[in-house]
Structure formats: C-alpha cells, structure tokens
C-alpha cells in the first residue's frame, strides 16, 4: 500500500493546513505545546493519516506519549537535530 496520507505536527502556533494532489495528501497541524500533539495525532489517525512526523520540538518522551495515545495505530517519526543544533534548539524551545 503506497503512502497517500501524511501528517506533520509542529510546535509553534495553532493552525491546520492541508495540501496535496489527487494521489497524495498532507495535513500539517501546529500546536502550542507537546501536550496538544496528542489530540492532533488522534484526529489524524481518525482521518486516515497513514504516517505522522513530529517536529524536532517534540522530545523522545513526548513522541512516546503520542505513540501510546494513538495505540500504535500508525508509524510516528521525529525530526532529529545533531549536536551542532543543541544551542539553537534550546533558544527556540526553552525548558
């Protein structure tokens, strides 16, 4: 089965954006906190999203919580940043 429905959750501001073609659809959801990512992921699964990617603002702990919250229904990946990005990421995502 080919990937035809992709979801991306980013921390920042609340928004929903959809784009795609007749053969591929993408939904991008912005959330203000990692906690809100759980509801966004559940909604994506309910809509038939086949794969969810989380922005680098989600820690491995939050990725695990989201995976558990959707009961492992679809694969969930996390964007990763190398050691050279640690200082910059700390400025963007304090605490």
Where would I find each of the regions flagged by the language model?
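N-terminal basic/disordered segments at the start of proteins
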Residues: 1-14
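Short, charged, surface-exposed secondary-structure boundary motifs
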Residues: 39, 84-90
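Short, well-ordered coil/turn segments that N-cap beta-strands
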Residues: 2-4, 48-50, 72-74
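Hydrophobic faces of well-ordered beta-strands that scaffold small-molecule active sites
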Residues: 6-8, 27, 53-54, 76-78
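Amphipathic, hydrophobic secondary-structure cores in small proteins
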Residues: 37-60
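Alpha-helix-loop-beta-strand connector modules within alpha/beta enzyme cores
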Residues: 60-84
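Short, charged/polar "capping" segments at the starts of alpha-helices
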Residues: 14-18, 86
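Active-site mouth loops of central-metabolism enzymes
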Residues: 22-35
């Amino acid at each position: 089965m080919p990937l035809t429905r992709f979801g991306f959750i980013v921390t920042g501001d609340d928004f929903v954006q959809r784009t795609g073609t007749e053969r591929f659809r993408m939904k991008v959801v912005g959330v203000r906190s990692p906690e809100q990512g759980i509801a966004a992921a559940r909604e994506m699964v309910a809509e038939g999203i086949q794969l969810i990617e989380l922005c680098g603002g989600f820690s491995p702990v939050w990725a695990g919580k989201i995976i558990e919250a959707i009961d492992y229904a679809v694969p969930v990946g996390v964007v990763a940043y190398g050691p050279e990005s640690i200082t910059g990421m700390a400025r963007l995502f304090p605490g």
